A protein has these predicted regions:
Chain A
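Transmembrane alpha-helical core residues of multi-pass small-molecule transporters
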Residues: 11, 19, 114-115, 142, ...
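Coil-to-alpha-helix initiation sites in intrinsically disordered, low-complexity, charged segments
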Residues: 52, 62, 66-74, 92, ...
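N-terminal Sec/SRP start-transfer signal
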Residues: 1-13
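Juxtamembrane/transmembrane-helix interface segments of polytopic membrane transporters
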Residues: 15, 19, 23-28, 154, ...
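Hydrophobic alpha-helical transmembrane segments of membrane transport/permease proteins
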Residues: 15-72, 165-182
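Membrane-water interface segments at the C-terminal ends of transmembrane alpha-helices
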Residues: 22-33, 55, 76, 140-169, ...
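Alpha-helical transmembrane segments of integral membrane proteins
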Residues: 2-4, 97-134, 150, 175-317
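An internal, D/E-rich "acidic patch" concept
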Residues: 60-120
Length: 317, 340
């Protein structure tokens, strides 16, 4: 067990080192640096930047040293919490990123708070009797909601609830301070898209458990059906969904981009896109690094949790 | 035993077409002209106006064949019908009586009304361009770029998967580590990083989709290969002294096909969503040609009102129906493959 966790930790560290290298290397090209120089020094564009001014700027920023030194410098700064400076927003990247991540965390909290009970409930109800009309109906709903892309779900919800009925605000820009009503549509969009996957995985796991001999024994020895489900089936059926739930965090970091942009919610995804469209290199580097760190950590938690929950693996390895 | 001799009847056209060669031929007849039409219109020269004509009967024949092959699953037939509806729209768009999709006529015309001598079934957008025409022309770009990107991702992912699974050892170590690194990026983050680095365009979307999906495909193929390479027929081929490339292409590849086809249907859906979403975000295909993501982007900026909501709904429903088609097709195929 300890060995497995250590092995995983080493693997995760290796992936982080490699990923950070890739992220640093692809944005450390001459082209991006010239753009940055123009943004800082002012001027009419990359073509008008003289070689001399560019060389001076590089020297002033300490960027004229060899690549590996710059990389080491960047990693050192990042480890100390210094993520550089955003040119578009004209402020330090660290606090900016923290602020946006907090907003996305609020969104993610509500998404998980709704998605987990809904997905598990639908999955368990469908998987209890595989092939029954209830299973077919619930499975169809799960496939259907997952098949509609987030952008389309966002549009449908906005048109009906914001533009048509006028019950909810159409945007979540939160210009006049935090307003929980503005969160409803983004959260609903993400939940509708994501719960179907969890429900399908829970259903598959539940359906498999229900075919096991010990369930048949429990039924045959006359236990009430409720106790068979709650006491015997669920314990084993929920191991696989647990890993899925943790891994959904990785998906959520992708999913929030389009939802945050559509609803103009000031979260991590919108920050990343704005930085990408502007060419705000330090923001892209920092945001990507954080995204990878979150994804790798959730992978680790999911793996360790799985081993912990499933004794067959814990003692087998 | 009955002794009556049956007079040999000529098999019907459909029955004769039910073999892999004919199906591949039909797919090429449908797909090559469409790809050229969308990606390299200048290359076609004077053929430009007629090149898609033979693709229309090819599409219809393929649809009939597919329905016959998958008639055991209602879900698969519904999915097929949705996908083939858009395929048919894509190949026949130039010959349908549509208004030019880029021509501004009467801005903000609601659906089912006539304005300036034109009847608009689905209304017009804020620049007065016909939405019906834009929705139908838009599916061409989404389908062509989506399918091409997925195909490229599959070719590369499968190659690496076969190599990693068959040679094992340090080939496997290196390929698996590289794919683990790529898989640790959230997909949309990876797309944004790649498209920022390369710049937004159709070709770069192919690169981005390949980098993002090839690792996952490689994992599936690698797993299947590790299982299949212990079979007797693989040993037989190795003992005969066949070249590794022969073993991989002739012995292994045909046997990993089944699970991959289901995965490909799902992945076609993901890619279509990704292209639409990236275009909506401003990182994908560029204006002014019609495209669903672009239609959403333009409408979301300037028409956020109840009376103009049709501008958002048309592209949203179009893309949803296509994705639903791919997903139902994958579900039906899985159901059918489990039944055998």
């Amino acid at each position: 067990m300890t060995r497995l966790i250590l092995q995983r930790l080493v693997q995760m560290a290796l992936i982080m080192v490699f990923a950070s290298f890739v992220i640093f290397a692809i944005f450390d090209t001459d082209e991006f640096k010239r753009k940055l120089a123009v943004a800082e020094l002012g001027g009419f564009g990359v073509a008008a930047l003289s070689e001399e001014a560019y060389a001076n700027w590089l020297a002033q920023k300490g960027l004229d040293v060899p690549f590996h030194e710059r990389y080491a410098q960047w990693v050192g700064d990042v480890l100390q919490g210094d993520f550089g400076h955003s040119f578009e927003k004209n402020r330090a990247v660290g606090p900016l990123l923290a602020e946006r991540l907090w907003n996305t965390a609020i969104l993610a909290f509500w998404v998980f708070a709704l998605m987990i009970p809904l997905g598990l409930l639908v999955g368990i109800l469908a998987g209890m009797n595989e092939g029954s009309p209830r299973d077919r109906a619930l499975s169809f709903v799960a496939v259907f909601t997952t098949s509609i892309p987030e952008i389309a779900t966002a549009i449908l919800l906005t048109v009906v609830f914001a533009l048509g009925l006028g019950w909810l605000p159409a945007k979540a820009a939160m210009i006049q301070g935090f307003d929980p009503w503005q969160l409803v549509l983004p959260v609903l969009t993400l939940v509708l898209y994501a719960f179907g996957y969890l429900a399908r995985m829970t259903r598959a796991s539940m359906a498999e458990v229900m075919t096991q001999p010990y369930i048949r024994t429990a039924i045959l020895k006359g236990l009430p059906y409720r106790r068979v489900i709650l006491g015997h089936a669920l314990r084993n059926a929920l191991i696989a969904p647990f890993t899925i739930i943790v891994l959904q965090l990785n998906w959520l970091l992708s999913g929030v981009v389009v939802v945050e942009v559509f609803f103009e919610y000031n979260g991590f995804g919108r920050l990343l896109l704005e930085a990408a469209l502007f060419g705000d290199v330090y923001v892209i580097q920092a945001a990507t690094l954080v995204a990878v760190a979150v994804a790798v950590t959730s992978q680790l938690v999911s793996d360790i949790g799985y081993t912990f929950l499933n004794p067959r693996i814990r003692f087998g390895a | 035993m009955s002794t009556t001799l049956e007079r040999p009847t000529r098999p019907s056209l459909l029955a004769r077409l039910e073999n892999p060669k004919a199906v591949i031929g039909l797919v090429l007849l449908m797909w090559l002209p469409l790809t050229l039409y969308v990606m390299a219109p200048r290359l076609l020269g004077s053929l430009h106006d007629v090149v898609l004509l033979p693709a229309i009967p090819a599409t219809l024949l393929l649809y009939t064949l597919a329905v016959r092959a998958f008639r055991g699953s209602t879900v698969a037939v519904i999915g097929l019908s949705l996908v083939f509806f858009w395929l048919l729209m894509a190949v026949s768009a130039p010959y349908l009586p549509l208004i030019d999709p880029n021509r501004p006529i009467a801005p903000f015309t609601p659906p089912l009304t006539e304005a300036r001598d034109h009847f608009f079934w689905l209304g017009t957008d804020m620049r007065g361009r016909d939405l019906l025409s834009r929705a139908i022309w838009g599916c061409q770009r989404v389908l062509v770029w989506g399918v091409t990107a997925t195909t490229v991702a599959y070719v590369i992912g499968t190659t690496f998967g076969l190599v990693a699974g068959y040679f094992a050892g340090w080939w496997d170590e290196v390929i698996s580590f590289a794919s683990n690194v790529l898989l640790s990026f959230p997909v949309m983050v990876l797309f944004i990083v790649i498209l920022t680095y390369l710049g937004p365009s159709g070709l770069n979307i192919i690169v981005a989709v390949t980098v993002a999906s090839a690792p996952a495909i490689m994992r599936i193929v690698r797993g299947l290969t590790l299982d299949i390479k212990t079979r007797d027929y693989v040993f037989a081929a190795q003992t005969r002294g066949e070249h590794p490339i022969y073993v991989m292409l002739i012995e292994l590849l045909p046997n990993v096909r089944g699970p991959i086809i289901v995965d490909a249907c799902l992945r076609l859906g993901y890619t279509t969503v990704a292209i639409t979403t990236l275009t909506f975000l401003g990182l994908g295909l560029q204006p002014p040609d019609p495209d669903w993501g672009l239609m959403i982007r333009e409408a979301a900026r300037s028409a956020m009102l109840w009376q103009f909501s049709y501008m958002l709904l048309v592209p949203a429903l179009a893309v949803s129906s296509l994705i639903l088609g791919f997903n139902l097709m994958a579900d039906g195929l899985r159901e059918l493959s489990l039944r055998d």
